[in-house]
Amino acid sequence: IIDGAMFGYGTPIGTHFAPHNPDYVDLTGNSNYDPELSKKLLAEAGLSEGFKTTLKLPPPSYARRGGEIIASQLRAVGIETEISNLEWAQWLEQVFRGKDYGLTIVSHTEPMDIGIYARPDYYFQYDNPEFQSLMTELNGTTDPSKRSSMLKKAQRMISNDYVNGYLFELAYTTVANAKVRGLWKNAPTQATDLTGVS
């Protein structure tokens, strides 16, 4: 998917955290591409003939190109997808607010927002009381090593529960004049801080 949708620019992930996060746990093995295992799991679920679903995609190229690749991979194991290319307003209304979708692709780029998984009303509707308790405990914990352990446990929970198919961290490619100084090498937020730029 990274090669086909992003021309090789991207880093595989297996959970909601990016690899540069100090508490990142490499769980990429949980979501390896394995068509034979997929067919076996479908058969165990009583869906050996496959099924049909929707794939609603927002405008960015990672979603549109990634969606075509994923639809092809799903088709190979018997899952037919109806792709709908949506504008952002449609995606927000149908998927994010309306929760009316089978599958979607979207980049979660907000830093440290793993707590969204403790909200059953969030668009992917994960409702795990154990995870919710863990997030409540995390929010009341200040000890860095305890927080780190909790964040690692949280990543394992959502990855093992397959809340989402974690694909890759988007590359943040930019071009800047060589004379410009002070730009961040890696962006910790979605904003570009120009206060130290000269």
Regions found by a protein language model. Name each.
Residues 1-25, 62-71, 89-198:
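Detector for C-terminal structural segments
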Residues 27-33:
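DNA breakage-rejoining catalytic core of tyrosine-based enzymes
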Residues 33, 58, 64-65, 86:
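Residue-level recognition of alpha-helix initiation/capping sites
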